[in-house]
Amino acid sequence: MTNNKGFYTKIVPIMMAFFCMGFVDMVGTATNYAQKDLGLDDATANIFPSMVFFWFLIFSVPTGILMSRIGRKKTVIISLLVTALSMIIPFIWYDKTSLIITFSLLGIGNTLMQVSLNPLLSSIVKGDKLASSLTFGQFVKAIASFSAPLIATRASLMFDDWRMIYPLFLLISVITVLWLGMTRIDEQKEDGKGATFSECFKLLGNGVILLCFLGIMCHVGIDVGTNVTSPRILMERLGLTNLDDANYATSVYFAFRTAGCFIGTFILARYSAKKFFGLSVLCIALGMGGLYFLHGEIILCTCIGLIGFGNSNVFSVILSRAMLYMPNKKNEISGLMIMGLFGGTIFPFFMGQATKALDNSQTGALIVMSIGVIYLLFLATKIKDKMNSVE
């Protein structure tokens, strides 16, 4: 009982940090509201999510190096402080420049958090239970992702200001910093010295790690793309003009993503990761295919939900396979895998350009996201159940 109590004392503040990690997914809702408020086209508005995920390319590996030197918990706390700062700016200064700064800080904070929080969780959860624990963390993260569009829409309707979401998330960030700071977590020693840039990037020369890296790029590209594009698809197909009437599409995506994470927590603890990964990618493919030619509110939301459900466990399976493949390189692997979230910059950019090229049709965005789906279908044939994980 004492051991269980000690475990829960450590796991709860870590899961609170996963909730704060979910703040990054408000970028889709914020982008669509800012696009409406500032009168931007899709290509210009997609700069905002690109600014969030650009920093994953720049800071992921340095964060892994920093984490090797100061520890995982301290790195997570720094990430939460940067995230809290990003919550302050848009509430007191609101224009295109302030949003670029806000999303940049949110991206930097989330990069620090993504790189350090997963290895911190692995300090208290071991072996084959890691994938299910990472998925549960993603479930908690998805609760924040799911609630953000609803809170923003409610704030827009009640206060005529969707930005009221920021003070709430600021408060949660501060509470998490204090709670985690007071929690003692024993971190395992890995190598005695911090990793270098060359050591981190050299891992990409390993075929298994490269496959996982590209898989995470495609996963997050689909994730961010669906987050931003779902309301636009509803507005285009259903002839809606008010964003408040279509913004719930993002919540539909994250509701199914949340459900998928919750279900995946139990399935991955008991059954084949390979089969579940394949089923997940198949759901994404079916949902994405349906968005090309189907009409009607219910069927479109079903397709969006399929993508959300399928994409909910892709990250956890790929990351856990990579970390278990090289267990003595968890910090470096985590840094490299999180660098793959740079896909959240690449996909929205090309989605915006493709949409513009097709006379502002969201079919352009779907074509770009489908490239990521095709790669994940390929990767599903390579994922293995053994600890060396990928063929």
Question: What are the roles of these predicted feature ranges?
Answer:
Residues T102-F139:
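Cytoplasmic helix-loop-helix junction between adjacent transmembrane helices
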Residues G39, G71, I92-T97, L294-H295, ...:
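Helix-breaking motifs and short loop linkers at transmembrane-helix boundaries and internal kinks
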Residues A131-L150, G335-P348:
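Glycine-rich segments within core transmembrane alpha-helices of 12-TM secondary carriers
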Residues S50-G64, S251-I263:
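Central cavity-lining transmembrane alpha-helices of secondary-active solute carriers
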Residues I58-K96:
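Conserved MFS/SLC helix-loop-helix module at the cytosolic interface between two early adjacent transmembrane helices
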Residues V27-G28, G205-T258:
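Extracytoplasmic gate region of multi-pass secondary transporters
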Residues F136-I185:
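Helix-loop-helix hairpin linking two adjacent transmembrane segments in secondary transporters
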Residues L112-V125, S312-M326:
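Intracellular juxtamembrane helix-capping segments at the cytosolic ends
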